[in-house]
Amino acid sequence: MTPSLHVAGLRFAYPDGSVALHGVDLTVAAGERVALLGPNGAGKTTLVLHLNGILHGGAGRIEVAGLHVDPADRSRLAEIRRRVGIVFQDPDDQLFMPTVAEDVAFGPANLGIRGDELRQRVDEALTAVGMADHRDQAPHHLSFGQRRRVAVATVLAMRPEILVLDEPSSNLDPASRRELAEILESLPVTVLMVTHDLPYALQLCPRSVILDTGRIVADAPTADLLADPELMRRHRLELPFGLHPVPTAARSSARPG
């Protein structure tokens, strides 16, 4: 099966000459949920912004569901940006219309979708995130957690191949954090989650990748990475007090035969 995402040999340097990515290779299968971990300045945002062609110009190749990300091909780039939906850390960066429904309809409408199909997409996306009852409200009247769910809906309405989430649990109270996790677990899309919230990564993503100094330094089951204290220390990742993940091998051996 064609993977949702295939990145091969991706290198990128900013105009000042600082190299942000050093030959990154990453493949994400369809339907996988993968956490992208790493300290600040590791290159996580730079990598994410390459996935739909916002950043480009370096070496390497990116494919989304088999489609080459080529910023020079404007028609293809529009399809890539439909397939790769990015939910930014601050939902207010994505919500700017008078009502929730208009915000969710904005992307599909720009694709030329109208009438019943547009209404169906809006209804489906808002239902998926539990916000259908708020469709006629102004986004600024919603709580932060509700606005984040609407931001997810704006991307779901595009029917993406990959949902990219930038720090989805930040600034959420415990109930909103749990509700968002339940929503994300229910979505039938590939998920790439950029996060410093290691318990959230453990809860939602069976697999994690650690990026540091522009290189992928680890790629394994999330529990295995978080249970390796030396790996965590080396890449400035810290678990909250009291969290002790059990490696997958230990869990398997503990099962009754």
Pin down the residues of each PLM region.
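H-loop/switch region of ABC-family ATPase nucleotide-binding domains
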Residues: 195-196
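ABC ATPase NBD Q-loop/coupling interface
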Residues: 61-79
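Conserved beta-strand-loop-alpha-helix hinge in the C-terminal portion
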Residues: 215-238
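Helix-to-loop junction immediately C-terminal to a conserved catalytic motif
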Residues: 52
